[in-house]
Amino acid sequence: MLSQKSIQIIKSTVPLLEKYGVEITSLFYKNMFEAQPQFLNIFNHSNQRNQKQPVALANTILQSAIHIEKLNEINLMPIVHKHVALGITPEMYPIVGAHLLGAMKTVMQDEATPEIMAAWTEAYRAVAQAFMDAEEDLYFETEEQIGGWKDTREFVVDRIEEETPLIKSFYFKAYDGKEIATYIPGQYITVKITLPGDGVDVPTDKMRTYVRHYSLSDKPNDEYYRISIKKELGKNTPNGIVSNHFHNNIKVGDVVPMSVPAGDFVVNNDSETPILLICGGVGINPLFSMLKETLVQQPDRKINFIFSTHCESSQPFKEELKQLEDDYKETGNLKINLVYSENQGHINKEIIEKYSTQHVDQAEIAETDVYICGPVPFMMQVNKDLLQLGFHKENVHYELFGPLTPVLEENQMLRGVKNIIEN
């Protein structure tokens, strides 16, 4: 727990963080990568170039200062899971802290008084210790589970299926032939790919390890992991390095190192309330896993699945969705609604109202479990529309691909105020 004096001092720095936040975090990353180049193998540098990462971290620090007295209420687990997937160790925290606090002092200069620096040092140590304790527990849990492991394990590509012109599904089996860990629908695996530098962050004559998280897109099973990767083609930006490598170069028989499944954006199959799954684009992946597993575990549960994409040719899992619709037609509990923006326009309040209330009454709306995944503007609009329609904000859950940024309202945003090391 922080002292009351430190809490008051940190709150007093909010105007400074509003003024200097992104400058601080940009300098932090620059200095840390120069001094610790091995960290280049942990962080996604495209998020550095487009400023998503510095902006996200600056917002995290700002929100931490605003809500500093509520730090013990913050859910650390989304970032704890990500840290375990990345292999973050306790030895890294002092390094990160030194560079972060050093950047604060450099940017704020005389405004960073000894009292302010002492308070932020105390706060960083408290947050770092909370992360280290939680990560130690999760490392043990994931390694000791049946089929579990620590760090990375080699998996071989068993088959590849083209879902759309830009999305391919890759099926992985354990290279050693041993059991694999199960997972909860909504979780992701983390792949580590070593490639020549991109010529921007790393020279082309040097190798670099790229780390990416990919949501598992099938229901849990004991044979394989499936991830469905969209080929990211940049618009006035470079193409996605790892996604293009998978599409252009990875073939059946190739071996890929990966971390154990992780993530806390997971479906609650202990609840019997209706479930609403709303996804856009490649955000379908974790929600499709949730859909398939919920149908197996809770065939009598009311499920509404809404998927928005540009057109029919950009829709993955066509045959699987059709088969699910046919298999559960008689129960009347499953509703699948496809929204093609090419014809219907982007998803909006009217569309959500039309489809989300198909087989639930007004009383059930307030208790419906909602899961959202897709582009940030999509999720912000969907969340706003859902709240206006009477869905309860405590029941709205979301997954963000990339650095954590606030998607929902302030009290929900506290879920995102959690990281010092962020991928």
Swiss-Prot record:
Gene3D superfamilies associated with the record: Globins, Nucleotide-binding domain of ferredoxin-NADP reductase (FNR) module, Translation factors
**Reductase: annotated span:** 149-423
| Named cofactor requirement(s) | FAD; heme b
Enzyme category, top tier: oxidoreductase
Which reactions appear under catalytic activity for this entry?
Answer: 2 nitric oxide + NADPH + 2 O2 = 2 nitrate + NADP(+) + H(+); 2 nitric oxide + NADH + 2 O2 = 2 nitrate + NAD(+) + H(+)
Member of which family? Belongs to the globin family. Two-domain flavohemoproteins subfamily.
User: What protein name is recorded for this chain?
Assistant: Flavohemoprotein B
What is the species listed in this Swiss-Prot or TrEMBL entry?
Dictyostelium discoideum (Social amoeba)
Give the encoding gene's name: fhbB
